[in-house]
């Protein structure tokens, strides 16, 4: 990543004491207060919480997708040793989908009901890698298994509503 100093640590994701607020005409809304996450390569994290607890805001901030009027007001975010706040849009474009992704909790609103789950996952894999259909299929099955989806081969052929 151009112009971004790489930190020496063994974490792929290293969020330390993140504080993020949204500055609205009505005042400051504190969305995240002292969030810390440390993940090594190969680890999988599921963030679970009540609606409005900051799950999406945390993920978006790591991927450089915090929408205005959101602003990081404290803490440090590193991905693969790189300081997220100093990354460019070009850096994020290379990272998103290939190195880090979000799977939203409601597949009925996140996946297209016209296409199988497998086709949609494979499309993202092929978009961000040089994998052919066979390799993309194998990787998609592996990812479904990795996150605890039972019978991943069967799920690949199903539609989101099934």
Locate the predicted segments by residue.
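ABC transporter nucleotide-binding domains
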Residues: 1-162
